Every structure is written in structure tokens, then in C-alpha cells.
Amino acid sequence: EMFACTDATTDENVWTNVGAGTGDVAPYTFQGTSYGYAYGGDQQPSPGAINVIDKYSYVSDADATDVGDLTQASYGAAGQKSSTHGYVSGGRIGGTYYNTIEKIPFSTDSDGTDIGDMTAIKYSPSGQSSSTHGYTSGGYTGSYTNIIDKFTFAVDADATDVGDITLARQGSTGQSSSTHGYTSGGYTGSFIDIIDRFTFSADADATDV
């Protein structure tokens, strides 16, 4: 195989195969190109926690549609995505906390499936995604936690503890670049403005950037 760069957009190069063999090298697009999804949540004043999977188009402005159900109604979960599936990890309903990891396919409208567990029950962690793994950082387990959990997209399996963010907290926002995950803000008895960064290339603690 031989590849030529056909799009030199910064951080989004596309390399096209011009030799023998098949397959081109396209950029990893975190947010997807066709649809957005919303999983679960807390609907007030009733019925409370829900298990609905909503899907909405990026192509046209329109309402979301209900395309499936999670295995467990919950709110305060983290979200991750691979190129083929969306993931929901953790969450709670009332005083019950969850450590489950659910997977939802993008190719068909269907229910989620339970494919593994995080290392601990977690409410309100933040979610990050590389091209190969999903991450949850921080959260609340009965006390604030600083654990970074990592699970693979290649097989259905439990997460492993691969490091710590700099400060245990819940309610942070998660962001992802092609090389790093970020945990920003949060609450640990008071609101904080810390931005933590951890690398996808190695299992290590986050740093305050």
C-alpha cells in the first residue's frame, strides 16, 4: 500500500491509498457526523429517572426521536463513544448508585446492553474517549473520588483503574482531543475551576494544566 495526503487540514489529515490493497486513513471524528444521542436522565416532576435513548439529526433541525432503552433508568452517568457505538457508564436512581457500562450501536436503533462494570459505583463522573478506549474520571461513590477508569472498545469487558485526577470531585465536564482526555471544573463541597489533562498513550495520573 502507498498513501498520499489528499487533505492537509490541521489535525484532520486524510491519507488516500494510491497503491495496491484497499483502505484509506481518515481522521478520528469524536463527535460523529450524522446523529447526536441523549441517554437517560432525570425527568421532573415525574416520572424521575428514565431509560430513554433519544436520537437527533445533525443534517436537519428537528426534534429527537425515542430509538431504544437503556437496561437501567438512571441519571448522572458519563458518556463515551467509539466509531460504532455510544457508551453510558455509572449513574444513580435515588440512593442507588451504579457501576455498569452500557453499549448502544449507531448502525441500528436498538436498546443498550450491559457489557461490563467500572471499578466502583460512580455518580456524576466525567466521560472521555480516545479512538480505542472509553474513560470515566472522578465522580461520587459515597465520597468524592479521583479515579480514572479505562475500558476498551475492542471487546466487552470491565474497566480498569489507570490513574488519578489531581482532585477528587463530581460534576466535572469531560473533553477529548485525539491524544488527551480532560476533566474540567466540578464540585467537592465547593465549586472548583481546575482543568486536568491525562494522556491516552499511557496509563498515568492527570496533571493540572
Task: List the predicted regions and their residue ranges.
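Polar, enzyme-active/binding microenvironments
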Residues: 1-209
